[in-house]
Amino acid sequence: MNILVTNDDGVHAPGIVALAEALRLVGTVTVVAPDRERSAVGHALTLHHPLRVTEIMAGIFAVDGTPTDCVNLGIHTLLAEAPDIVVSGVNRGGNLGDDITYSGTVSAALEATLMGIPAIAVSLATNGHGSNYRAAAAFAAQLAREVLDRGLPRDTFLNVNVPDLPAEELGGPVITSQGKRDYGGDIVTKVDPRGRNYYWIGGNEPVFRDIEGTDFHAVKRGRISVTPLHLDLTNYASLSILQSWDLSACRPEAGQPSGALL
């Protein structure tokens, strides 16, 4: 089995080192990961400058791009054959609830799924530097075996969040839905020595709703959350509502200004 491993914390991050080691018991591992921290880049793809790749040792490649770039390069260029599975992680910090929309870790798995390859995103739900990557990686390797044996539903990948606990203290895995985070004004304003304002985004601790059956609910109780995510983002329940709207007045008229600002 050929396994492509990537992340958004960078090729030298402890999570990806532990993950690659665990997955070598499952198949042949190739690591293609960003050459530096790329957290919260979402599904960004580099289009306006060339990408550089460095093979830092046999089967381990560092890319000066995003996790999505890494998956593309791995599948289409760096691997001799397409991988049987892509595993992204182990991320430092959880990817829970609405936060998955920002996650480079999750987006790497999404990109693989777009290409028809089974994929798993794995995160260690820690507020610090994390110390139990091996436990998370061991679970990811076992889950990868299951996915390789059973397959996944079409256009579906798995988002896994593992509490930052020793293996013997972890609760069993549970299948969950995506949770919900409440967003506030998480902007920290500072003043530089020249009197100009600068800003940090995300300065406050995230607040998740503790809803039974969700990823956050499981992780908070020491259990491993496994959430199936789907490529189709359509809100089918809203289709009939929107179809009842009269949108005829929204058609642009000839001669209207372009709306250019400059």
UniProtKB/Swiss-Prot annotation:
Query: Where is this protein localized, as stated in its record?
Result: Cytoplasm
Which positions bind a divalent metal cation? Answer: D8, D9, S39, N91
The cofactor(s) it depends on are: a divalent metal cation
One Pfam family here = SurE
Q: Keywords assigned by UniProt?
A: Cytoplasm, Hydrolase, Metal-binding, Nucleotide-binding
State where it is primarily located: cytoplasm
- Its catalytic activity? a ribonucleoside 5'-phosphate + H2O = a ribonucleoside + phosphate
Tell me a GO cellular component: cytoplasm
Task: Give the EC number(s) listed in the UniProt record.
Answer: 3.1.3.5
Name the InterPro entries on file.
SurE, SurE-like_Pase/nucleotidase, SurE-like_sf
Provide the top EC class. Answer: hydrolase
Q: How is the cofactor bound?
A: Binds 1 divalent metal cation per subunit.
Record bears the keyword Metal-binding = yes
GO MF annotations, alphabetized: 3'-nucleotidase activity; 5'-nucleotidase activity; exopolyphosphatase activity; metal ion binding; nucleotide binding
Q: Which HAMAP family match?
A: SurE
The UniProt entry's sequence similarity note says: Belongs to the SurE nucleotidase family.
Q: Which PANTHER family match?
A: 5'-NUCLEOTIDASE SURE (PTHR30457), 5'_3'-NUCLEOTIDASE SURE (PTHR30457:SF12)
Q: Sum up the protein's function in the record's words.
A: Nucleotidase that shows phosphatase activity on nucleoside 5'-monophosphates.
Its protein name is 5'-nucleotidase SurE
**Lineage of the organism:** Bacteria, Pseudomonadati, Thermodesulfobacteriota, Desulfuromonadia, Geobacterales
